[in-house]
Curated annotation (Swiss-Prot):
Keyword NAD: no
Keywords of this entry: Cell inner membrane, Cell membrane, Membrane, Sugar transport, Transmembrane, Transmembrane helix, Transport
Protein's name in the database: Lactose transport system permease protein LacF
Membrane-spanning segments: 17-37, 77-97, 112-132, 151-171, 208-228, 269-289
Encoding gene (name): lacF
Lineage of the organism: Bacteria, Pseudomonadati, Pseudomonadota, Alphaproteobacteria, Hyphomicrobiales
Amino acid sequence: MATTSRSSLKRYYDVNGWLFVAPAIALISVFMLYPILRSLVLSLYTGRGMMLKFSGTGNLVRLWNDPVFWQALQNTVIFFVVQVPIMITMALILAAMLNNPKLRYSGLFRTMIFLPCVSSLVAYSILFKSMFSLDGVVNNTLLAIGIIGEPIGWLTDPFWAKVLIIIAITWRWTGYNMIFYLAALQNIDRSIYEAAKIDGVPSWGRFAFLTIPMLKPVILFTTITSTIGTLQLFDEVYNFTEGTGGPANSTLTLSLYIYNLTFRFMPSFSYAATVSYVIVLMVAVLSFLQFYAARERK
């Protein structure tokens, strides 16, 4: 009898639990799962606007022969390969410096470093475009101290335009990642570092062989989120180049290309859906590789 009552009670709580989460599941299904599945079906069609016909792998053939897609893919990979390691390294170093209990005004420094990620995207884009213009403060400063002989075309030269985008997103998101590392560092027992110091381990050794291994779960998390964010890079490129991805498509990313295919050029929803699944595939593969590289080895 008691067993039957416990079983009934468990079933009651199970049903109640599902009823509580049912509205959230329904909303997720309507606003997330359905668009994902719909875009997958849409990628099997070709045409302009809503005048579509089934083509199977037609969009994949178009993708393979599309030079603009390959340019956007190359730019996205460059941003990922260059920017993410720089940002993660800087965030780690800043967190280690701010974790020093002897550092004065650490709260002020934390606020200053974190502030860019909560600043207005449009405002900071306008500020960066002004600072890095031909007669902006950056060029004037570099000219004044003799580093360059003529102004750099930060917004007009393909190479320097990429550099500017990398500088901008690194400036904006380094503080965001630093907060995660700082929170993790403050949960590490200081006696571990004191013992290592007594044993004669230098500061770089304590950082490399104590701090980094203990922060591995947080590093994995921030690396994956940064990877996803960089592969979906859109905001900075759109605001800096007014949606063109210029000069000469040198800053065009996959996300901006999808936007242009959908809203800027003659609508090609099905082809845009196909390109979007390239981002999904890249995120899945890179996330798996990062999880695999960070796995616990016996």
